[in-house]
C-alpha cells in the first residue's frame, strides 16, 4: 500500500512539473490576419420613451365601486387636492 501511495505521489509531481516552461524564453505569438469584425460596429439607437399609466386605483378597484374614492385618496397622498378616474380608467389628479 505504501508503494502505491508513493508511486501516485511521484506521478502527480511529474505531471505538475511537466507543463512548466522557461520563463526567460521569448514568447512566440501566432496571430491570424485580422479582419474588421462587423459585429463590433455598434449603432446608436434612439431611446424610446416609456409611458406607464397608473391604472391600479381605477381599473382594479372599479369592481368594488370605490374607484373614484381610491383615486382621490391616491392623489391626496401624493400631495394633490384630489382626483377622479377618467373614461380610460386612469387616475387623473387635480393640481
Curated annotation (Swiss-Prot):
Short name of any one Pfam family annotated for the protein: Defensin_2
Native source species: Formica aquilonia
Origin organism lineage: Eukaryota, Metazoa, Ecdysozoa, Arthropoda, Hexapoda
Keyword Isomerase: no
Disulfide linkage: 58-85, 71-91, 75-93
Similarity comment text for this entry: Belongs to the invertebrate defensin family. Type 1 subfamily.
Propeptide: 18-55
Segment forming the signal sequence: 1-17
Protein name stated in the entry: Defensin
Entry keywords, A to Z: Antibiotic, Antimicrobial, Defensin, Disulfide bond, Immunity, Innate immunity, Secreted, Signal
Subcellular location: Secreted
GO cellular component: extracellular region; extracellular space
Amino acid at each position: 500500500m505504501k508503494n502505491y501511495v508513493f508511486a501516485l505521489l511521484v506521478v502527480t509531481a511529474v505531471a505538475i512539473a511537466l507543463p512548466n516552461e522557461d520563463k526567460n524564453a521569448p514568447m512566440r505569438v501566432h496571430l491570424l490576419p485580422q479582419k474588421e469584425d462587423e459585429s463590433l460596429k455598434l449603432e446608436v439607437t434612439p431611446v424610446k420613451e416609456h409611458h406607464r399609466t397608473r391604472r391600479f386605483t381605477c381599473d382594479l378597484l372599479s369592481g368594488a365601486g370605490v374607484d373614484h374614492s381610491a383615486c382621490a385618496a391616491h392623489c391626496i397622498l401624493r400631495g394633490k387636492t384630489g382626483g377622479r378616474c377618467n373614461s380610460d380608467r386612469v387616475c387623473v389628479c387635480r393640481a
